Amino acid sequence: MSLRFILGRAGTGKSRACLDEIAQELKGSPQGPPLLFLVPEQATFQTERALATMPGLGGTIRAQVFSFRRLAYRVLQEVGGSARIPIGDLGKRMILRNLLEKHKDELRLFHRSAGQPGFADALAGALSELKLYNIDATSLDRCQTEVIERQGAGLLADKLHDLALLYGALKTFLEGKYTDPDDYLHLLAQRIPGSVMLRDAEVWVDGFAGFTPQELSVLAALMSACRRVNVALCLDPTELDEPCDLDDPFFRTRETQAKLLQLAFDRGIVIEKALHLVPAPGQSAPRFQHPELQHLESFYFRRPAPPWLGGTQSLFVCAAANRRSEVEGAAREIIRLCRDQGYRWRDVAVLLRDLESYYDSIESVFSDFGIPLFIDSKRPAPHHPLVELIRSALEAVLRDWAYEPVFRYLKTDLVPLSRGETDRLENYVLAHGIRGRRWRDREPWLFRRRLTLGEDALSEFSDQELAELAEINGARDRARAALASFHKAVVGAKAVRPITAALYQLLVDLKAPEQISCWIAEAEAAGRIEEAHAHRQVWAAVIDLFDQIVESLGETPLDLATYAVVMEAGLDSLKLSLIPPELDQVFVGSLDRSRCPGIRAAFVLGVSEGVLPARPKDDGIFDDKERERIYALTGLELAPGSRRRLFDEEYHIYVALTRASERCYLSYPLADAEGRAQLPSSVIARVRELFPQVTERTWLLEPGSLPTGAGLSGSAFAGAATAETAAMAQTALAARTTKEAAMSAVERELAEEYIVHPARSLSYLIPSLREALARRPVPLVWWAVYSWLAERPAWRELLARVLSGLWHKNREQDLPKPVSRRLFGDPLRASVSRIERFLACPFSHFISHGLRLKERRIFRLAAPDLGEFFHAALKQFGERLRRDRLDWGALPREELFRLTGEVVSDLAPQLQNEILLSTARHRYLTGRLQQTLSRAVIVLGEHARRGQFRPLALEVGFGPEELLPPVQVPLTGGRWMDLVGRIDRIDGFFVGDASWLRVIDYKSNRANLKLADIAHGLKLQLLAYLDVALRHGNRLLQGCALGEDRPSSLSAATACHPGGMLYFGICDPLLSTGGPLTRDEAERAILKEAKMCGHVLADPAVVAAMDGQTRQGYSPLIPVGLKKEGGFYSASSVLTMEQFALLRQYLQSIVARVGEAILDGLVSIRPHRRDDRLACSFCPYKSVCQFDLLLQDNDYRLLIDDPPEKIWEKIAAGPKAIFEGVIR
């Protein structure tokens, strides 16, 4: 029984010496006593591989590789102690959460923090630390007593009391049934003397810089039980007799050697002569193939140190703009090494101190470059379908089958629905607001959306509707079956075990195990071994999570909401530990845990200030001062504090600088992910000090500008087709003499650095091709890249797609006239809003009315729904007044409120499948709608009281099978266009045998109408409605029901004149005043806010018929101001009879031109821009047209608001000048 050290600095061959000695033993006696190689957990696979590939060994069972944890499993299986149920980290946290609640009255300090997120994690970490350092509850009690005796009660004493209490409670809970994995090494140390396997065994220990007290106990037991224990440590054997300071990189290993020597001395273990691995004078260590790297290893931590004279060929310092360019630069250099220097992927390692920040960039960039890699890091699995299924199933039950969790559940591909069925089901659910009971009951869904409010419900479904409903209900039954059973099982459950059992039954009902097995088989068949392994691990981890929850909380009373929180924490903690799927791949690891022996080139990324060396975090139960006080007062040793961990960073730096045998790259980004400037680490400064002429590089994301040299002019390239361009480039290259075509040194350097992978080279090629399109010269190297890609079938298609993007013009070709007429109909039938849409952008009109694309319907109360509701309500209100022969202006307020209440009660259930009755919020909104409607009818009543205009018709339709015929607009070639629509309200005023008509359009918010709006074609509705009313005025007058107000002089010959065209905003305005108002003042202010907008006839008599109480000043009802001496203020919105006539002619011209353009197939992408208002702002088809100002053919059609005089001139000239950009 003896102890022997194998000592040497980095690269001297310590690991190789261990392997060689094991190999020698195996060759000498293949059947002898066991040979154990003890290494860190993360190094077991690499060490097993190294041992298995030792030349001349073949298969053996005598030599085995173990980590401390794996050795514990093996020994406990042999001598007993492994039968108890292990409790993992999650189980321990849940147990501690229960113990905190159970003992909260006894806790002195922790009761305040017990419910805080993360506290149970911190507490579990503290107890694990105590176990690793062999401190039990009794020791904590003694420590607390000594602290109180020597410095009195306080925060530290209370911490120690609570920790001792919870430590003891945890031990009592686990005793006799469960095993804490943190106790495995303690049990191992106790069981080693009884192990037959370890008798006469020889042990090699390698890869450790230090050991916890638990691990030291195991090593002490091994020294007593085994024939010999060999421990390899990284330190300088020539400096063993010299003092070692805390900032020495070998301080930790020197300290570790001292502890092992003391353990051996205390147990009477023979200490053999150490094996010192020291290079001969003037020679490099076996690892380092270049003296520069040996110089770096020898002198980095020595001061003063001789600088390296001359440049470097194996040491490089690289600066990058950001992390992405840093990773891409490393990827390009790795490919260059493998392409030009004979490296294999496995000869390269990428090392980082902060792997998490670089993880996503490395994974995506290396994949783009085609570099196989293995990232030595446990990966979270929060987005795996199985994890998402569990999370969303619990959330669906808790949120009463709300849309979001239900469809996250259905989209996991673990539910027996195809993706198409899921999409159709989702559309139906969104359109009808289905949730809760409607999902769970067995009644079939027969919802359908009404087209307009107030229509009678259709009694029968069409055959197509029945088929669609049958498909929807079939998909719904399969979607709900398993989840409904789960819901029924867990709703009444009050303990952990039945809820977990129901969750497992849900997976069984869905046949999740079988589906995951299929995914594994598919992945393996496609060669995606890593993906298959991930599926296996996730399933195993989820089942283990269920076991942990049941074992730790079992019959603990827990409601479903709390259970979901516990399960969420467990799912978030799932990590995937992946074994390298290939032998030849780049290794990516972190400096503090990964081992990567035998590499030729190391890329150390992220060598930035604050990252390497890393800033220690002090986030445990004990801070640094408390750790020092505990040690000073009681002698109990805890884990190193942040100050000591900061010095340990020096060892990580030493490891990083000495991993590679041939090349070491140190790189740093100049900015972080948010664009903030970052400084290089002190490591960079020290390397520059030690190597004044170190080779420095800059890694750019894309190649910078180059001299064009013998580059091919882009003028010939511009506008050419793909095949023509290929021939052109080939001809140009072949035609040049050798001297002319030779690449410059700069270009060749560029080619060597950036042209390393076809896909990435193609992305770098694109900017150069853009330069060619702009008729600027392009460096010859990019034409060479172009030719290489064009000559190879594997890349030719991708190149063609890229080039098609360069020539892409986002410009739609007009439709052939026969196609357009079949698509839009001939004769064309169009509403005024359709005309306005075309004038806003022809392509938007094509999508909405040609292809008839519609946005997905969603069960919510949007602005159009409110508009529809108010239109229907005012129509119904007006019809009731007409039916009961009531005068709008004479009704008292109480009667108005009663009538609006009845109207709202009648219409509310009809809006979107009772949306206004669906929730308390919507029921409250119904009351607000009634209040707004009441305010509107009060204002309209004021119009009736103060004026003489009376409603002639409400909701008047014009078109086929409507009250009024469509407006037939003649087009060229004998064609015509039918203009159709619906007018909210037409009012009339009569004097003798003449009448004046005005049209009113209801808006759910305030709207304005400027002359420029009409001129630009943006707001034509009011003008078109007035034109229709005037065309059919006599028919309206004959059919109206004015009752006693109907003048006897009305006849078919009555002349109809334009009275006005007005918007009425339906709103309940919120007043902003400087002080309190009386009731009358408030009413006047509200009336002013609800003033109609638009244009009225410039006739005082007509104005008086609209507001007879305003003799001078501005009317509170209409947009008119009267001067005292007569006439109108300039701000009045009035038009003369001639101007109304001119606008009507202008309207006819616009409609005719638009009709011609539609039937001629005009579908151009030409949105307008008016000041800062864009046609695209509220267009639902932006993703379809892909309008982009960066594209040459995409630009806005600018609309400029001219002064009124100039607008009238243009209106008189017709629409040609104004709509030149839209209509040909």
Swiss-Prot record:
Gene3D superfamilies recorded: 6.10.140.1030, P-loop containing nucleotide triphosphate hydrolases (3.40.50.300)
An example Gene Ontology biological process: double-strand break repair via homologous recombination
Domain UvrD-like helicase ATP-binding per the UniProt entry, residue ranges: 1-326
Residue span, UvrD-like helicase C-terminal domain: 283-584
Entry GO MF terms: 4 iron, 4 sulfur cluster binding; 5'-3' exonuclease activity; ATP binding; double-stranded DNA binding; helicase activity; metal ion binding
Pfam families according to UniProt: ADDB_N, PDDEXK_1
Subunit structure: Heterodimer of AddA and AddB.
Family named by the database record: Belongs to the helicase family. AddB/RexB type 1 subfamily.
Described function: The heterodimer acts as both an ATP-dependent DNA helicase and an ATP-dependent, dual-direction single-stranded exonuclease. Recognizes the chi site generating a DNA molecule suitable for the initiation of homologous recombination. The AddB subunit has 5' -> 3' nuclease activity but not helicase activity.
Name this polypeptide is given: ATP-dependent helicase/deoxyribonuclease subunit B
Organism: Heliobacterium modesticaldum (strain ATCC 51547 / Ice1)
